[in-house]
Amino acid sequence: MRASQLLISTLKETPADADIVSHQLMLRAGMIRRLSSGLYTWLPLGLRTLRKVENIVREEMNRAGAQEVLMPSIQPAELWQESGRWDQYGNLLLRIRDRHERDFCYGPTHEEVITDLVRNEIRSYKQLPSNFYQIQTKFRDETRPRFGVMRAREFIMKDAYSFDIDQAGLQRSYDAMYDAYMRIFTRLGLDFRAVEADNGDIGGSGSHEFQVLADSGEDAVIFSTGSDYAANIEKAEALPAPLGETPERPAPQEELRLVDTPNARTIATLVEQHGLPIEKTIKTLMVHGSEGGLVALLVRGDHELNEVKAENLPEVAAPLTMASEEEIRAAVGAGPGSLGPVNLDMPLIIDRSVALMSDFGAGANIDGQHYFGINWERDVALPKVADLRNVVEGDPSPDGKGTLSIARGIEVGHVFQLGTKYSTAMNATVLDDNGQAVPLLMGCYGIGVTRVVAAAIEQNHDAGGIIWPDAIAPFEIALVPMNAHKSERVREYADTLYQQLSDAGFDVLIDDRDLRPGVKFADQELIGIPHRVVIGDRGLDNDELEYKGRRDSDVTMVPTEGLLSFLRERITK
């Protein structure tokens, strides 16, 4: 491609409304332009990268045996009502009514459509397993679209759906997709982790997220320093006691005593005013119970409640709803800053770390008073114990190997075992080998294709601009003929070299614009072309070309005859 024929709309200034690096650089590099809130036009440079991501995804999905289909973006309300998600999905669902007063939605996902297709096309277990995927535009009516294409309303997604006759088959399909995702993100050149995750609103059981590690990531990624264990913050667990220690509760050393604490409405104030170590305090949080009334959840004062773990408890109503102060006072007779387990007449569930505490402090369920020296089984019967908290840096890994570290991540892929959630709701059955109708077991597997582009930039950039991995750069090589408008020799050599490199399978941009070299170099750095070759009269006099990798600080002079092999060694396909 000739730069003179390419729309290169680079910007020197950073747009004021771009908050994160990927959004800033995609605008400055002329990859995207904003049309409206959460809606973006992909310009030629951006589209080249987007298509390369799509191609890698498509190749690996095909390699894994999935079949490509293309389903409508607009979906009839009847399917969503059948699955029960028409009302459940809420305002994220863009609802449309046609001229005949029929309700539709612009699909944010396609579980209903693919289930409808399969229940009409697949009749027998002999047609299984089957896996279908598409790469298609979705729409979610985000309240606050932000961060450019990272959290846009319209986006491109690869979504796949597997169908099996039994759990063993579903596990095989799931494992095949997991392996395909590992290959995809490795080929994309990303530093990522596959982490255990909660299924959330999708439903079902068994789930992994694929997180690109980046300081700007919205998600906390937890991984062990001594093993392959990794999970997101919602799913991550830790051993209840440090490595090498037996998880036993120390014997009581203190008597229970009631203390006036008139101004201690928070853990921090209690610790500051009364000298109690924070790890000897308890937070009592009250939530709505699944059978009505309130349920008390207890975590250590220096820990935070994990709301996903709490919501998954059978005793807790979903979605998780914290009790209001009015509800708490009506049930207990005290406010939120004075709650604790002693004489508390409601169901209690305590975190595993709380179960190991002795001589601790907590509210007395009387405004302005706390109990100190509380001990389980002496002062309060030991209630139900569960994993309720977020892990913290340095916690022992749940597999007993190493400790937990926390990094930031950007979710770019997610795989789920859905089970029969949709097939049961929508009566998608097949005949098994006994001739009995059984519901299909489903898996679903998504990759945010547009988000991958932004995540790659968040992980690969410097002060000069984007640093693309070779596999998804809009161009692998930039050829820069110096003074080509004056030197016929440089111009002819550049044209010949361009053709040779293109014939060798490289994706090449020849910068034939009538601009100063510094402007061309700055554009190429901003755009992120990973390899640059400069052709000049002085170099040709010595049968040399100037090479500079995007991450290199210095240039390298390469013999003209050896350039092809030199580039082949450096460019990762």
Curated annotation (Swiss-Prot):
Domains (record comment): Consists of three domains: the N-terminal catalytic domain, the editing domain and the C-terminal anticodon-binding domain.
Annotated organism of origin: Chromohalobacter salexigens (strain ATCC BAA-138 / DSM 3043 / CIP 106854 / NCIMB 13768 / 1H11)
InterPro entries cross-referenced by the UniProt entry: aa-tRNA-synt_IIb, aa-tRNA-synth_II, aa-tRNA-synth_II/BPL/LPL, Anticodon-bd, Anticodon-bd_dom_sf, Pro-tRNA-ligase_IIa, Pro-tRNA-synth_IIa_bac-type, Pro-tRNA-Synthase_IIa_type1
Pfam families in alphabetical order: HGTP_anticodon, tRNA-synt_2b, tRNA_edit
Protein name: Proline--tRNA ligase
SUPFAM superfamilies, per database record: Class II aaRS ABD-related (SSF52954), Class II aaRS and biotin synthetases (SSF55681), YbaK/ProRS associated domain (SSF55826)
Catalysed reactions, as listed in the record: tRNA(Pro) + L-proline + ATP = L-prolyl-tRNA(Pro) + AMP + diphosphate
Keyword Nucleotidyltransferase (UniProt): no
The gene coding this protein: proS
Protein's cellular compartments: Cytoplasm
